[in-house]
C-alpha cells in the first residue's frame, strides 16, 4: 500500500476535526495548529478554506458510501441492495447533518453549497452502481415494458430514496413494495 501523501495526512486530520466538532469548526489555522505545521503548508495543498471543506466533505462521503454500500454483496438482488442502501444512507446522512453540519449557519453559503454538491456527486456515483446491479440481477422479470430500463428504474428509485431521506420520518416501504411487485415474479 502506498504511503499517505502530506495532503492525505492533512485531510485525515481535517476529517477528524469535522467529525468531532462539525465542518463549521474546520479552519486553516486550526488544522495547521493541530498538525503542527505552518498555515502556508496547508495552503500549499488547499488553495482556500472552501477547497479544504470540499475535500473533507468528499472524504466523508467516500468513506461512508463506498464502505457501507458501494460494494454489493455477492448474489444480492437489486431490491435487497436498495433496502440495505436506504438503511445505510439514512444513518450516513443523519450523521452528516447532525454532526458535520451542526452550527452550519456559521458556514458561508458557498461552503454549504459545495458540501451539498459533493453529496449530490456521490448520489450520481451510487446511481451508476445501481444500474449495474439491476442489469446483473437474474431475478428481474425479462418481460418488463421497454421504458422500464435499468437506468430509469435506478434514477426513479434513488430520487425517491433521497426524497424520503429529506422527510421528517423516512420510510421507503411503499417504494420497495412497488419495486418488488413490478420487477419480480410473484
What are these regions (language model features)?
Residues 59, 63, 88-96, 160-163, ...:
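Phosphate/oxyanion-binding loops and surfaces in catalytic or ligand/nucleic-acid-binding neighborhoods
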Amino acid at each position: 500500500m502506498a504511503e499517505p501523501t502530506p495532503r492525505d495526512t492533512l485531510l485525515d486530520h481535517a476529517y477528524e476535526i469535522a467529525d468531532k466538532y462539525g465542518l463549521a469548526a474546520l479552519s486553516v489555522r486550526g488544522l495547521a495548529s493541530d498538525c503542527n505545521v505552518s498555515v502556508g503548508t496547508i495552503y500549499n495543498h488547499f488553495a482556500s478554506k472552501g477547497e479544504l471543506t470540499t475535500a473533507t466533505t468528499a472524504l466523508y462521503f467516500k468513506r461512508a458510501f463506498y464502505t457501507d454500500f458501494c460494494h454489493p454483496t455477492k448474489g444480492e438482488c437489486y431490491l435487497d441492495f436498495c433496502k440495505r442502501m436506504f438503511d445505510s444512507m439514512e444513518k450516513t446522512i443523519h450523521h452528516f447533518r447532525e454532526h458535520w453540519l451542526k452550527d452550519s449557519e456559521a458556514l458561508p453559503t458557498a461552503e454549504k453549497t459545495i458540501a451539498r454538491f459533493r453529496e449530490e456527486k456521490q448520489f450520481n456515483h451510487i446511481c451508476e452502481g445501481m444500474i449495474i446491479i439491476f442489469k446483473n440481477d437474474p431475478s428481474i422479470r425479462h418481460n418488463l415494458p421497454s421504458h422500464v430500463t435499468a437506468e430509469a428504474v435506478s434514477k426513479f428509485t434513488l430520487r425517491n430514496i433521497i426524497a424520503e431521506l429529506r422527510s421528517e420520518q423516512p420510510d421507503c416501504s411503499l417504494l420497495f413494495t412497488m419495486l418488488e411487485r413490478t420487477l419480480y415474479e410473484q
